[in-house]
């Protein structure tokens, strides 16, 4: 399998080159570009996924609808569409809502996220057909219910989810 090359970034989020995806998460991590997609249904509920146990970091934790890293020649929107199709088997128009920078280390694997994370939102009108190599479960939740759940059981959630929910307003 060919290595996946993603976009390394500086403190301002400007591309400064490329780095292999796994290498970007090793040791203390390297700042890199990422996307986090938040898909809502017509009732305003958010689709969240439980990450597969096969993931190389933060396996088995609940996260937003899907995440990925734009490859070196890929736009943010294309990366979002690729991730939605690969992880959830769906397509939705998305728009960028915000950018969040965060760092988080997986206590199990030692892999570190240092992400300049583009937050995208969309409305999903079809039923997801998730890829079990990426996702082990999905569910629809209200944002308020999700915030309460994260407060009560933070260990069940990927660390970027509460960070994004605190920094980004999802109200229409």
Language model: regions and residue ranges:
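Nudix hydrolase/Nudix homology domain
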Residues: 23, 60, 72, 101-107, ...
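Acidic, metal-coordinating catalytic segment for phosphate/diphosphate chemistry
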Residues: 1-36, 40-42
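Hydrophobic alpha-helical segments and helix-packing faces
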Residues: 30, 55, 59, 72-73, ...
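A glycine-rich, hydrophobic loop/mini-helix early in the fold
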Residues: 34-66
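The catalytic Nudix box helix
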Residues: 47-48, 63-97
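A structural signal for short, well-ordered beta-strand segments
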Residues: 37, 66, 96, 118-120
């Amino acid at each position: 399998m060919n290595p996946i090359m993603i976009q390394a970034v500086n403190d301002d989020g400007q591309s400064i080159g490329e780095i292999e995806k796994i290498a970007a998460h090793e040791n203390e991590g390297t700042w890199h570009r990422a996307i986090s997609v938040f898909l809502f249904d017509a009732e305003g509920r958010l689709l969240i996924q439980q990450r597969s146990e096969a993931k190389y970091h933060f396996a088995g934790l609940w996260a937003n609808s899907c995440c990925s890293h734009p490859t070196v020649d890929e736009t943010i929107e294309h990366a979002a569409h690729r991730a939605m199709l690969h992880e959830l088997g769906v397509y939705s128009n998305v728009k960028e809502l915000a950018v969040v920078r965060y760092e988080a280390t997986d206590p199990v694997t030692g892999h570190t996220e240092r992400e300049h994370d583009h937050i995208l939102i969309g409305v999903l009108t079809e039923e997801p057909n998730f890829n079990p190599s990426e996702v082990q479960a999905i569910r629809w939740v209200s944002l308020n219910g999700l915030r309460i759940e994260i407060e009560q059981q933070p260990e069940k959630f990927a660390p970027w989810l509460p960070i994004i929910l605190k920094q980004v307003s999802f109200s229409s």
